Amino acid sequence: MLKAVIFDLDGTLYDYDAAHAVAWEALSAFVESRLGIAPERFAALHAEADGTLRRRCGGGSAIHNRLLRYQVLLEAAGKPIALAPAMAEVYWTTLLDNAIPLPGAMDALARLRAAGLRVGIGTNMTADWQFAKLERLGLTPLIDFMVTSEEAGAEKPEARLFELCAEKAGCAPGECAFVGDSLKGDALGARDAGMRAVWLCRKSGATQAPEGVAVIRSLNELPKSLSPL
């Protein structure tokens, strides 16, 4: 019997790619105006800083810290690190301003809660910005619990994050469904952790559903995919 449904956040409950694209454009323009670094060069520096941070931290939640990433970038570029907080502010403010719930998101959450199920978030990110996103999206009142990779000390598709989701839901993994847009990180990770896996694949074209994974094209299809509850 299904008792809880857990959702990935970025790319599942809102269009992360679209919001990120606008935020990245704003950040690139800011960096060019303040530091004279062209967008192409900034993109290369950003990729290098991301790689450096991942090597230094060995994974973990620090890789999601944009303030830290911009600090590393500025240090490598020989620029004042004092600009890092402003860079982070530009990025996050723009992303939040452009974050809009995907069609069916609010209705799906509300219907699940009305059916007596617990609703949670399972995300590879830090708690501070995920709470900010949920608040901006107007979804906070519909969420019972959240597990971030920061809290779990593990990133999807590692089992630990899914196990902690089930623990917070107060039920066994087999009594949980996990919904996400990443086949490997969300769907296969959840399936391998013993949960019902639902892959939100919004791309057009035929999709071969892996064994043990349900596929939906929109969150409007979720209630049917989960029935019978």
Regions found by a protein language model. Give the residues of each.
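N-terminal helical cap/lid subdomain that shapes the substrate entry/recognition surface
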Residues: 2-103
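Asp-based, Mg2+/Mn2+-dependent phosphohydrolase catalytic module
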Residues: 1-5, 18, 40, 84, ...
